[in-house]
């Protein structure tokens, strides 16, 4: 801008003198009249004024353009300064970012090293866990095989024990009818222990039991009538009877003093329940019922009935199944037969025709989920047995347990055709399978097995005509 202004000023200073010199030369010439000269001079003056105005306008434009260019230069300088500041800030930020990136790279390298260490540890842990899982799987297989073998051995042992118990019961039935003159036959029943090392544990136990039976037969005195019912030998409680269930089954056998009773009597068995008719109001609840799941069960009781059928002895119902555990008979069944139900619809039909003679009989129904084995004992004798009945099953807790009626719903839905008519006494339930020796001792009043979870002490009468009594001997009960 400064150069163009200087060029314009130089041109103006050169052009004006030349123009004035030409005008003066024309004025000095004598040619022509005087008047045209002044006119030319006026025109020239006007042209000069116009030129001056144009020049002034041009100079003003140049000045304004110079100011604009100056402002633009200032702006450019400010922009350059700002750009430099921005560049410096960018450089500083780039430097800080580079430093942070270097730190991040260092952290990443550290994390990678730690990750490799963790991966190594995880692989080692995975290998260790895999080996342990394989070892545990092998141990589980071995334990399962041992458990299966133990269950098989236990099942065989239970079968052997019950068979030996049946033989012992048969021997016990023969001993009371022997005459005094035949007492010498007692030793013949016991094998001579010439070679004890050849006898197994079961044979030794059988030998000891037979020796005990022989000693008992020597102190038993004169023979009695073999047709009489089984003799109870519990020490009777206080004399008299009443209609309140205040007595309890013996909890500890050591607290009971056993002594012989009159032949043909069953004494000291505890409370007695009498169901006089088939009314659906005749029901007894056992509380609190089963509080834990049962994988084995033993139900034993003295029973007397003369109605021609047994009816329902026991019924256990839950919300999802009203026949979780039932011992019941009805009009449509064969007289004396009873259905043993565990987890409806599975059941077994048990023969109990011996109970229809109007006399007291002792029954024990035993079941275990191991191979689903079950046994029925009547008056110490094994009358029915089987297996594969609800194998591995558990009777759930929390249901309603009643005597004398069959439940079609929890605590109700009774039917008179399935009601029990008769008497029960000495009822008890165990959460294990009693062995034949315990069943025999219970039937003859020798010893009450330990661990009973329910007895008639847990009974609660629910109205109706059921009578509760504590009889000195069963034959004296109503």
Swiss-Prot record:
Keywords: Calcium, Disulfide bond, Glycoprotein, Metal-binding, Secreted, Signal. Residues 1-25 form the signal peptide. InterPro entries: ConA-like_dom_sf (IPR013320), Neuronal_Pentraxin_Related (IPR051360), Pentraxin-related (IPR001759). Residues 269-473 form the Pentraxin (PTX) domain. SMART domains: PTX. One of its GO terms (cellular component) is extracellular region. Binds 2 calcium ions per subunit. Ca(2+) 2 binds at residues 406, 408. Disulfide bonds join 300-364. Glycans are attached at residues 67, 91. Coiled coil: none annotated. Its cofactor is Ca(2+). Induction: Not induced by bacterial lipopolysaccharideS (LPS) or IL1/interleukin-1 in endothelium, monocytes or neutrophils. Not induced by PHA in lymphocytes. This is Pentraxin-4. It comes from Homo sapiens. The gene is PTX4.
């Amino acid at each position: 801008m400064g150069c163009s202004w200087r060029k314009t000023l130089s041109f103006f200073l050169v052009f004006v003198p030349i123009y004035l010199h030409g005008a003066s030369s024309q004025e000095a010439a004598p040619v022509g009249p005087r008047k045209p000269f002044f006119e030319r001079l006026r025109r020239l003056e006007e042209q000069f004024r116009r030129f001056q105005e144009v020049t002034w306008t041009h100079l003003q434009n140049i000045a304004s353009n110079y100011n604009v260019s100056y402002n633009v230069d200032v702006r450019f300088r400010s922009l350059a300064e700002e750009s430099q500041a921005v560049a410096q800030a960018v450089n500083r930020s780039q430097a800080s970012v580079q430093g942070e990136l270097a730190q991040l790279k260092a952290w990443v390298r550290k994390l990678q090293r730690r990750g490799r260490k963790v991966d190594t540890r995880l692989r080692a842990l995975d290998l260790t866990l895999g080996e342990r899982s394989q070892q545990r799987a092998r141990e589980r297989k071995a334990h399962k095989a041992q458990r299966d073998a133990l269950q098989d051995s236990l099942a065989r042992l239970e079968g052997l024990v019950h068979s030996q118990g049946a033989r012992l019961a048969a021997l016990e039935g023969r001993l009371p009818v022997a005459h005094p003159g035949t007492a010498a036959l007692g030793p013949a029943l016991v094998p001579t222990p010439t070679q004890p090392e050849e006898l197994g544990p079961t044979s030794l136990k059988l030998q000891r039991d037979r020796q005990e039976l022989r000693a008992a037969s020597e102190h038993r005195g004169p023979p009695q009538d073999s047709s009489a019912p089984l003799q109870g030998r519990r020490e009777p409680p206080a004399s008299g009877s009443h209609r309140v269930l205040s007595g309890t089954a013996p909890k500890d056998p050591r607290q009971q003093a056993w002594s012989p009773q009159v032949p043909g009597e069953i004494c000291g068995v505890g409370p007695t329940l009498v169901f006089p008719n088939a009314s659906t109001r005749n029901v007894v609840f056992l509380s609190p019922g089963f509080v834990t799941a049962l994988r084995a069960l033993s139900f034993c009781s003295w029973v007397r009935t003369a109605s021609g059928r047994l009816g329902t002895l026991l019924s256990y119902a839950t919300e999802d199944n009203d026949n979780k555990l039932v011992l019941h008979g009805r009009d449509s069944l064969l007289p004396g037969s009873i259905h043993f139900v565990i987890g409806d619809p599975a059941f077994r039909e048990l023969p109990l025709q011996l109970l229809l003679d109007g006399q007291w009989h002792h029954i024990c129904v035993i079941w275990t989920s191991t191979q689903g084995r079950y046994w029925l004992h009547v008056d110490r004798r094994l009358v029915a047995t089987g297996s594969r009945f609800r194998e591995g099953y558990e009777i759930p807790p929390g249901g309603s347990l009643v005597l004398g009626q069959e439940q079609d719903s929890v605590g109700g839905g009774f039917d008179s055709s399935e009601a029990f008519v008769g008497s029960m006494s000495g009822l008890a339930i165990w959460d294990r399978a009693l062995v034949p020796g315990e069943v025999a001792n219970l039937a003859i009043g020798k010893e009450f097995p330990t661990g009973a979870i329910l007895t008639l002490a847990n009974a609660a009468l629910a109205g109706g005509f059921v009578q509760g009594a504590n009889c000195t001997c069963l034959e004296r009960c109503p």
